[in-house]
């Protein structure tokens, strides 16, 4: 049965468990769920591995409340912490944990965030232009949209949305502001629609998707945070520990690919008569994997997922 796009079904759950299983089959494994969200992946992992302890991190306080309730039956085996995932080493240390056997990142916007009309993540719902994962800090998308210059808006939309009509969209935003602030998601979506040629609008899904992605990424500093988090997470893995990352757009996937490639390669140039030192990490996915055809059919959010995994080897 096909589910609604905003219904919470963990993406790539079976593949995630399969990739993490060898690392979690030790006597007392620890895993960090760096983006615990509503706790779907963590719940399944705690059920599958009775000795597992999970430290779950999220910047979204609303999600943490729901995850805490969902995971209450596991008692002390599940610890939920409000933090950014580039702080996961500090979070682990605060819990008395120096290394972990598994780490999971499920990046992007959760189904709950899309479903909450006051968050501003969904271009199909009337809502204030917020887009902050943590609404207690930082500037909202509305503040950015209504105060930044044409050049700044163009850069954000082009760099984080990979939108070729970035300059046209920024110009129309500036023009719309003359009549008053752009305050709602539907107003922004309409501005984007009017900025893109009709022929282009007829292909590739909703034309506002890339612009909304751009402002969400910028407001939450997602790329910079992820760029810091992945190397930190790799160092936190125990020998034979494994990390799985689920990403949903090319900007995220490129960061993960680059970090994984760097640590899984030797530093000796090819062709030199030198015995290379073995790499400290081994790729478990040669390239990024997608969801199965069946999962994409029943869970719309899985359609864009890219899965990468890596294992720490003996030094």
Spans of features found by a protein language model:
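S-adenosyl-L-methionine-dependent methyltransferase catalytic core, i.e., the SAM/SAH-binding region
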Residues: 1-315
């Amino acid at each position: 049965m096909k589910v609604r796009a905003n219904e919470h079904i963990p993406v790539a759950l079976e593949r995630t468990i399969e990739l993490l299983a060898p690392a979690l089959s030790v006597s007392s494994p620890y895993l960090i769920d760096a983006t615990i969200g509503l706790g779907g992946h963590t719940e399944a992992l705690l059920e599958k591995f009775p000795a597992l302890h999970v430290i779950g991190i999220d910047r979204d306080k609303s999600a943490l409340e729901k995850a805490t309730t969902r995971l209450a039956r596991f008692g002390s085996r599940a610890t939920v912490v409000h933090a950014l995932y580039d702080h996961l080493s500090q979070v682990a240390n605060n819990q008395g944990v120096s290394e972990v056997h598994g780490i999971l990142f499920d990046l992007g916007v959760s189904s709950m965030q899309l479903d909450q009309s006051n968050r501003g993540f969904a271009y199909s719902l009337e809502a204030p232009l917020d887009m902050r994962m943590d609404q207690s800090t930082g500037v909202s998308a509305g503040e950015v949209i209504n105060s930044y210059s044409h050049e700044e808006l163009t850069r954000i939309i082009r760099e984080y949305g990979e939108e070729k009509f970035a300059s046209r969209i920024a110009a129309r935003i500036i023009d719309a502001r003359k009549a008053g602030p752009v305050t709602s998601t539907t107003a922004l979506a309409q501005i984007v629609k009017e900025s893109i040629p009709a022929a282009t609008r007829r292909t590739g899904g909703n034309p506002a998707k890339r612009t909304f992605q751009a402002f969400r990424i910028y407001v939450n500093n997602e790329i910079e945070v992820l760029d810091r988090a992945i190397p930190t997470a790799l160092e936190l893995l125990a020998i034979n520990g494994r990390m799985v990352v689920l990403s949903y757009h090319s900007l995220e996937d490129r960061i993960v690919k680059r970090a994984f490639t760097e640590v899984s390669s030797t530093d000796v140039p090819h062709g030199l008569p030198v015995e290379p030192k073995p790499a400290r990490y081994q790729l478990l996915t040669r390239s990024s994997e997608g969801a199965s055809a069946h999962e994409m059919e029943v869970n719309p959010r899985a359609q864009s997922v890219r899965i990468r995994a890596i294992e720490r080897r003996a030094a």
